[in-house]
Amino acid sequence: MSLFFAELRKVWGGRVFPALLAILAAANLLLLWMGTRPTAKQPPASAYRAVGVELSDKTMEEKGVYLHNKYTEIESLVKIGQYYRELAYGGYGLTQYRQDNAAMFDAYEQEYTDKTYTLFTDNLNTEYRLFSQLQSEYDTVAAYSDFLDGVQTKASQLSGISIFQNDRTGYDLKNIELTAQVYAGLTETPIDYYPQKGLYTAISYAFTDLILLASMLLLALILVRQERDSGLLSLIRSLPGGRLKTAIAKLAAFVASLLVVLMVLYGVNLAYCSASFSLGPMNRTIQSVPALMRCTMQITVGQYLLRFLLAKWAGAFVMGLWVMLAALIAKRAAAGWIGALALPLAMYGIRAAIPATSHLNVIKYANMVSLLQTNELLGNYRNLFWFGSPISLPMVEWVTAAALGSVLSVAFCTVFTKAQLLPAAKRSLALPFRHKTHATSVTREEGRKLLLMNGAAVFLAAFLAFGIYQGVTAESYIDADEIYYAYYMKHISGPWSERSRDWLKEQRNEFAPMLEAQKRVNRGELSSEALLAYNSLQQKYSAYQRVLQSNISYYLKENPGAWLVYETGYKKLFGFTGTSDVQDTLLAGLLCALCFSGLFAMERKGGMDEIL
């Protein structure tokens, strides 16, 4: 036991690994935040949270009514908005569309023009994506009893079809019958829907597994690689209990540390997603989560999270054993890291190449990469082809984990006890020629240290590529109001002149019939229904009034001599609207931290700061 605690102290006793783990956890949080930030195609986290609060005090049936009604309303408003948008562009054939959808216009047109609708997001299109997704999720879990009935019905129907009875291996018929038996005991499972975005994002974020792999490399570096490269491992192995017992202690320290790493990484995920999206009630059944509805265990979400952590720990330990073995057996550190990453990459290629329905699907799932796909293991049900008989996916993966874990553990202990494991000789490179020295300057030398020696050029290139990707994939929706506003502002852009004033006065003539009708309605000569014919013109008039009041009457009086410009694009470019400026500030701070973090530290470490 003393050896075990000694190995643990190597990991946690100093400041190196805890600090690096904190950096990895922060990187994981940053990537998670960047991956879930609101975009043109992705609603903000606050919207999921607000809808969850709205649904929390409703029954399952009431949730369905609310989501379907809200979806119908938003879909209708989006269609009406598209109608007005086409109208603003001078589209033709819209009269027939209005007649064909008269009921929709009667129900929602006034709501659209008055903007009395409530939104959980910033605009109707994002709102439509939100409720389209939530309605689909609800319909999936609400039909859980139908799904179970369908499994049983399909089993009874297909078992009588000759093509299944005459199958040479009998696999298809056995698979159908086994699936029906597994789901037969789940008919009394209660369903309580809640938006799954927060929960499923926290436990399925792909970058967390990559950061987990990076932490394995760090643990292997501390427990194995440093001691071998420094020659300390040879001394340790010469002591009593320095071989087999030490090897076992290192593996035990590795698996214990790995559990802490998992708890930190997924704790960060769950905490962030809980604060941003909300995870929902922990006591609802796991079948209430649409992505995990096919789970065959009768457990709650909280119990699933506990099993998820344990299963992920087991899969990570198996992959970590290979990382430890590769780090130990390689003569040089670089070869060890390449070997540690090569096998998982090869297994990922095998997994991607074999279809899930292939008769070789056992090979697809019996590898290290599949062991880390925990939701696939626990949250789904699948039978694999095993010499003509169906075998469950959990059975295949648990046997694989046990077999690989045993083989790799024995291999690590054997190599640790019997191999020489001497430190590699340092390479010396004698150049047949001498470099010519060139005059330099302080600025040039500091720039070289910053960009090349400190790696700032790599970070700058990565951030530049990320910025280009963001720019290429960015989307912006222009509604009818903005189309009309752009029409007016582009005509009067530039210095304010008599020509611009006269043009705006001419444009007012277009609204004369509508304004006269409004006066007659106010005097009681006409009913308010008479204004329905001017709905599209009212929207254009609101943009006209915006130009007059905000830009002419207010801005030009406050800033005499100023030029007018269509400013919407500039506001988006410089982050005056939305929250993109917050993201840009965080990214700029991160870039500065990465670029300048080692600039002074490397001089101070070598004592060069005193010389300089």
Locate predicted features.
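Membrane-proximal extracellular/periplasmic loop immediately following the first transmembrane helix
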Residues: 38-157, 475-551
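Membrane-helix interface segments
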Residues: 16, 242-243, 332-337
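Helix-loop-helix units of permease transmembrane domains in multi-pass membrane transporters
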Residues: 3-12, 221-260, 442-446, 597-612
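Transmembrane helix segments
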Residues: 34-37, 333-366
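Juxtamembrane non-transmembrane "cap" segments at the membrane-aqueous interface
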Residues: 278-285, 355-374, 425-430
